[in-house]
């Protein structure tokens, strides 16, 4: 099993390039950064993680800028979005950003995506909450055309463009791995149709169904759709840095465990990284 670490990289935390060096030096496989363009000062959308939304949600750097800084000082560390809010981004520009980071990193980018939870944030981007999943699907399919075709063309409900040239193309072919976040009733449909893996948050697998059972269901659905079940990567966000917890994840069929790090300065973060590194 591979191990990664995630942090809301902010203006008051350890720099993303410094964090990347620390992780690579200690044998971590990957580094992950989340995304929020902003947080509306007034909102009714509940945060899935609890009552009070941490301020790092509105202080976080742009993920592609942070990961480019990380790429510049590392050679093997994989670099992922966890997750990118595709529904808040223009797909033509996003396709270029993904391909650019993948090329500048030498093919180390992992594209974690999701639909988000903050209705007010989405509304500021002119995205309708109820249609966000249809929008996400089209944008991903359109980006795949841009990444894989010399003259890309796409005509859908939300995304529409005639033949065009768009470079760079990603190093990884046909494109960087796409991992779907979330754990809703239709998540597996999206994973099987247009993604390369599933990336749920630890402890949110739903009542009555264990993580291991869900992984079995996902692999079965993939097989029924004609896909190789082994090609579906399982990545767990927010894994508990404890030997027993890691052993349970591995037994369940998890391919990658990602530890959460606080958005804090270097002196606070380094001891936590060192403790997590003992599990690698």
Predicted regions and their residues:
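Active-site-adjacent structural elements that line small-molecule/cofactor binding pockets in enzymes
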Residues: 1-280
